[in-house]
């Protein structure tokens, strides 16, 4: 990790804290998830949910969305100023599923946002606890990353749909703060920036006046976030060019797309955190676990251990495979949508299959789906081993930038090679190396050409038994070097639509 003196760890970002030592960080992250758990228990009481209904992931998601909506200041203000038919700006709600006479029923509930905010604050010692809200946003984002493809969004901004491995966090709301920025992939940042530049091209007032000044500050901040994700000097220098541009236009869009492509091999550092559904924290708190006293980390053994002892259920549609539904949620819980399937399978202890082979749709149930035929089953969220989360991107030391298969952004710090189809990636780099960024482009292409798919990343890093609390005995798995593991291969998932 570069310059640890200036960077805050992501738990500090998550909890909005200044620099803290490890124990303080564990305590404040514990306080955060404990607050989520207390809130969830209180909501289950309010809604009179049975134990089984409270463990239903669809109910958890509805409750999470309600609290996020209750605290969405900007949208609340907008709704009050632009009243739309049938939307009460002061209320929030969603579907709650109840078990009645051996069948699942859907009930639409409506609550005052004020009431939800009161319950949330009460569960969080009277504070707004924005960190907890961000945590829920990241869990929803990780679930979207595992469930949907963003091909359309990529194509719309002029990027290649094969760059899907760069799109972590692409559905995170803007208000997700520093913790949200840490988990966004290179492609996500590039896409946000391209959208901004395009607006500037089409609307000549976008960069002007008082508003334009604020826009400009936001633009430069996003550029700096993206620059911080790159690990080579040439990529960072190109980001400086993009940031300092007087009047961002097509040249900047070109540069950004070039950088996004380069990140397929010279990978950016993107944080991965295990954010679990609220009901999981609720179950632990209800069983008497004191998160703040025990401490908690999003990147160590804790989430694995929590999932080992939690029973969560999900509604299952008639022709869905419960094991596949479990895989989807497992990947979301570990933020592993862009991880190599060989690594995920090894850690999970059961084969993790590419999304194109999953017989399951998303976790959420649309309001027009027939409840008569709905069944429910237990989600298998346990793992055989555990591994440390990484944010390095897995670049090997010799060039601080190594091979990345067209679809991997490593989640776990586990030794493996990162296979990639060099021909496919390099084909995108023909042509334009002139202009003011020519020397940087040449340098980036040179580094990419020298990357080898067989290079080993995370040298010596292994997985650990779940009983190995202090991570003393790494088990280094050996993988078939030729066999790459892209989750998005042969993909037929549905698009993400807001």
Curated annotation (Swiss-Prot):
Superkingdom assignment: Viruses
Pfam families: Flu_NP (PF00506)
Cell compartment(s), UniProt: Virion; Host nucleus
Keywords: Capsid protein, Helical capsid protein, Host nucleus, Host-virus interaction, Ribonucleoprotein, RNA-binding, Viral nucleoprotein, Viral penetration into host nucleus, Virion, Virus entry into host cell
Any one Gene Ontology cellular component term annotated for this protein: ribonucleoprotein complex
InterPro entries: Flu_NP
Processing and modification events after translation: Late in virus-infected cells, may be cleaved from a 56-kDa protein to a 53-kDa protein by a cellular caspase. This cleavage might be a marker for the onset of apoptosis in infected cells or have a specific function in virus host interaction.
An example molecular function term from Gene Ontology annotations: RNA binding
One GO process term, biological-process aspect: symbiont entry into host cell
Homology family: Belongs to the influenza viruses nucleoprotein family.
Alphabetized HAMAP family for the sequence: INFV_NCAP
Protein name, entry field: Nucleoprotein
Source organism per UniProt: Influenza A virus (strain A/Duck/Hong Kong/7/1975 H3N2)
């Amino acid at each position: 990790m570069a310059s640890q003196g200036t960077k805050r760890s992501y738990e500090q970002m998550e909890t909005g804290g200044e620099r803290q030592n490890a124990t303080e960080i564990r305590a404040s992250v514990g306080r955060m998830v404990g607050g989520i758990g207390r809130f969830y228990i209180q909501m289950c009481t309010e809604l009179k949910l049975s134990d089984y209904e409270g463990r239903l992931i669809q109910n958890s998601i509805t409750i999470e969305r309600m609290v996020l909506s209750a605290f969405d200041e900007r949208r609340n203000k907008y709704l009050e100023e632009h009243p739309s038919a049938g939307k009460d700006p002061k209320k929030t709600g969603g579907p709650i599923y109840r078990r009645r006479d051996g069948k699942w029923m859907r009930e639409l509930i409506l609550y005052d946002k004020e009431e939800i905010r009161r319950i949330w604050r009460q569960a969080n010692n009277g504070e707004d606890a924005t960190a907890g809200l961000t945590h829920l946003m990241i869990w929803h984002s990780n679930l979207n990353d595992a469930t949907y493809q963003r091909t359309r969004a990529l194509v719309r901004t002029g990027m290649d749909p094969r760059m899907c491995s760069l799109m972590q966090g692409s559905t995170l709301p803007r208000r997700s703060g520093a913790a949200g920025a840490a988990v966004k992939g290179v492609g996500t940042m590039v896409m946000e920036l391209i959208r901004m530049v395009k607006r500037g091209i089409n609307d000549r007032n976008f960069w002007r006046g008082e508003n334009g000044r604020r826009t400009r500050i936001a633009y430069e901040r996003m550029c700096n976030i993206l620059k911080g994700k790159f690990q080579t000097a040439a990529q960072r220098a190109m980001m400086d060019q993009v940031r300092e541009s007087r009047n961002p236009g097509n040249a900047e869009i070109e540069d950004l797309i070039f950088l996004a492509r380069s990140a397929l091999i010279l990978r950016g550092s993107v944080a991965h955190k295990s954010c679990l559904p609220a009901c999981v924290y609720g179950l632990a708190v209800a069983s008497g676990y004191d998160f703040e006293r025990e401490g908690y980390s999003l990147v160590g053994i804790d989430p694995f251990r929590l999932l080992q002892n939690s029973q969560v259920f999900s509604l299952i549609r008639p022709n869905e495979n419960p094991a596949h539904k479990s895989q989807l949620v497992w990947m979301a819980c570990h933020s592993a949508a862009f991880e190599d399937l060989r690594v995920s399978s090894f850690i999970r202890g059961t084969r993790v299959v590419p999304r194109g082979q999953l017989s399951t749709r998303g976790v959420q149930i649309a309001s027009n789906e027939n409840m008569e035929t709905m069944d429910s089953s237990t989600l298998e969220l346990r793992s055989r081993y555990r591994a440390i989360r990484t944010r390095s991107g897995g670049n090997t030391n010799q060039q601080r930038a190594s091979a990345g298969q067209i679809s991997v952004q490593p989640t776990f710090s586990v030794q493996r090679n990162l296979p990639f189809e060099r021909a496919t990636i390099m084909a995108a780099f023909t042509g334009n190396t002139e202009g003011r960024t020519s020397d940087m482009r040449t340098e980036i292409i040179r580094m990419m050409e020298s990357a080898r798919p067989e290079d080993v990343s995370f040298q010596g890093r292994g997985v650990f038994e779940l009983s190995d609390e202090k991570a003393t005995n790494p088990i280094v798995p050996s993988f078939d070097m030729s066999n790459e593991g892209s989750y998005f291969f042969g993909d037929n998932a549905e698009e993400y639509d807001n």
